[in-house]
Structures are given as structure tokens and as C-alpha cells.
Amino acid sequence: MMFTVFLLVVLTTTVVSFPSDSASDGRDDEAKDERSDMYELKRNGRCCHPACGGKYFKCGR
């Protein structure tokens, strides 16, 4: 009986984890793109981060 419950929990956990892995791929790629944009702006001498005091209002957005 305990083995059956254990097996059910393991299978349920495995099935539930697959959709969440594939859903995060698109969001992760989008976040990487934003980071690369920020680094490019930083190399050009512009800072789009709010901590910079809003010096640059046209930050490629």
C-alpha cells in the first residue's frame, strides 16, 4: 500500500514538472534579450536604470 502511494506521488510530480519547464524557456530567452540590450546601452555610455537619475529618457524602448 505504501509503495503504491509513493509511486503515485513520484509519477504525479514528474508529470507536473514537464509543462512548467517548457513554459519557462520563452520567458528566460526574453530576459536574456533584455540583459543584452542593457549591456549594449551601458557600453554606449547610457544608463537606463532608474538609479541613474533618469538622465536618458530614450533608452531604446
Curated annotation (Swiss-Prot):
Tissue spec: Expressed by the venom duct.
Misc. comment: Found in injectable (milked) (IV) venom.
Pfam families listed in its UniProt record: Toxin_8
Protein name, per record: Alpha-conotoxin CnIJ
Domain comment, as recorded: The cysteine framework is I (CC-C-C). Alpha3/6 pattern.
Main location: secreted
Sequence similarity: Belongs to the conotoxin A superfamily.
Domain of life of the organism encoding this protein: Eukaryota
Intrachain disulfide bonds: C47-C52, C48-C59
Annotated InterPro entries: Conotoxin_a-typ (IPR009958)
